Amino acid sequence: MKVADVPQDLKYYKGAVVRDQNYAVDDEGRYHMVKSDGWEPKNEALALALQDDKDKEERSHMRVQPTTDFQGFELDLRHQPAAHCENGAIATLLSYYGIHLSEPMIFGLASGLFFVHLPFVKMSGMPVTAFRTFPGILFKRITKLLGIKTVTKRFLSKERAMKMLDKVVLEEQKPVGCVVGMYDLPYLPPEYRFRFNGHNICITGKNEVTGDYCVLDSNATQKVTISRDDLIKVRFATGGTYPLLGQMYWIKSVPEQLPDLKPLILKSIHKTCRNMTSQPDFIPWAGANGIRHLSQSIREWEQKKSSRKAKQNLAQVIRMLEEIGTGGAGFRFIYGAFLQEAAEKTGLTILNDYAMRITEIGDMWREFAYKASRIIKKRKGENYTYDELGDLLQIISEKERQFFKDLDHTNESKRSSTGFEIL
C-alpha cells in the first residue's frame, strides 16, 4: 500500500476503514500517514470554538516548541501515531513488553465504544457528549483481560508525583502513562490546545542534566520533549473538565503466556453490546438511549438558547464526534476495523458484515456532522434545521440499538457453537 494511493473521499481501502483525515489503516491493521487539508465540518467546528474561546487572546501569543533530538536516558520505544490518545498510550506500554496489538483491537477488546450525553456536566461551558467509555477504563479493562498486573497512582504532592515518575522510568526502567491537560502542552499547535484534562502521553526517558523528559504522544508527529516545569503543570492541570492529581499508570508485570484472544474478543463484543442497549429508561443519557436523548434536546436548543449558543453546542458535539481522537464518526470507523480484525482472528467471517454495518452508521454520523456544520455556517441555499438534525439522530439511535442487539445475538450463537465462554 502506498500512502499516496489512499483516496480521501472513500471510507474503505482494500476492505479496511480509512480511519481519519490524517491517517489510514491498511488491511493488515497498519497505520499510514495521509496528506490532507482536513475535513470541513471538523475545521468549521474548531474555528467557531476558537473564535469564542475565552483563552483566545492568550492563545494568540502561544508558540510551538521546536522539536529537538532528545539527549539522555531513553527506553527503546518508537513513536507511533494513533487515532485516540489512550489507545496509543496503551499500545506503547504493551509494545515495550513485546505485546503488539493494533489500535482497533485494543479499543475493541477494552469495549471502548459507547455514547453518553450529559447536559449537567460542562466542558468549556457546554454539555459533554462522549462516544467512548470514560478515561482510564480502556487501560484497566484490557490489562485485566490479558492477565497483566498494573499500577495506577494519583498524588496531592507535585514533588512526590515527579519522584515516583523518575523512580519508575529511571530505576525500574519502565515506560509510564500520564494523564495530562492539553492546554499547556508546549509541543502542540495553539489551535489544538484546549482545556481538556484527559489526554494520555507516555514518558519514556529523562535528561538528568536539563530535567527534560522524553514523551511519546500519539497526537504528535514524532518523539517530543517536555521540561520538568511544563510536565508538572500539565499533570496537575486545573480548569477544564476536572482538576488532575498527577495520575500515572504503568505495567508491573505480564504473564509468561497471554490468554487466547478468541474468547476475549467475543466477551468484549458482548460487553459493548450490553453497554449500548441495556441502559434503563430512567438513565436517558447513555447508550442508544443517550443518542435519542440528544435527538430530543437538540430540537430545543435554538428556542431555549440564543442562536449563537445553539451553534456553540453543535460545534461541541462535532468536535467530540470528529476531533477528539475518535478516528472519525465517534469511534464507529475504528470499531468497524476491530470487527474486521476480529473476524480474521476468530474465523467468524460474519463479523465482516457487521463491520460494514457499523461503518455505514458511521457515515450517518458524518452526515450529521456535515449538516450541523452547515447550520453553523449558514451558507446560501443550505437550509438545514435543528429538527432535521434531531430526526437524523433518532434514526441513528434506532439503527445503533438494532445493530448491537443483532451483533450480540450473533455473537452469543457463535459462542455457543464454538464453546467460547462469555462471562
Regions found by a protein language model. Name each.
Residues 316-423:
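Charged, long alpha-helical assembly modules
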Residues 95-104, 339-346:
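Short helix-capping/linker segments at secondary-structure and domain boundaries
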Residues 208-324:
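Noncatalytic regulatory segments and standalone regulatory/sensor domains
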Residues 50, 61-101, 112-246, 250-255:
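Conserved active-site-adjacent core of cysteine acyl-enzyme catalytic domains
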Residues 3-7, 11, 15:
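A short beta-strand micro-motif
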Residues 13-44:
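Acidic, low-complexity, intrinsically disordered interaction modules
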Residues 6-9, 45-53:
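A short, charged, amphipathic alpha-helix used as a generic interaction element across diverse proteins
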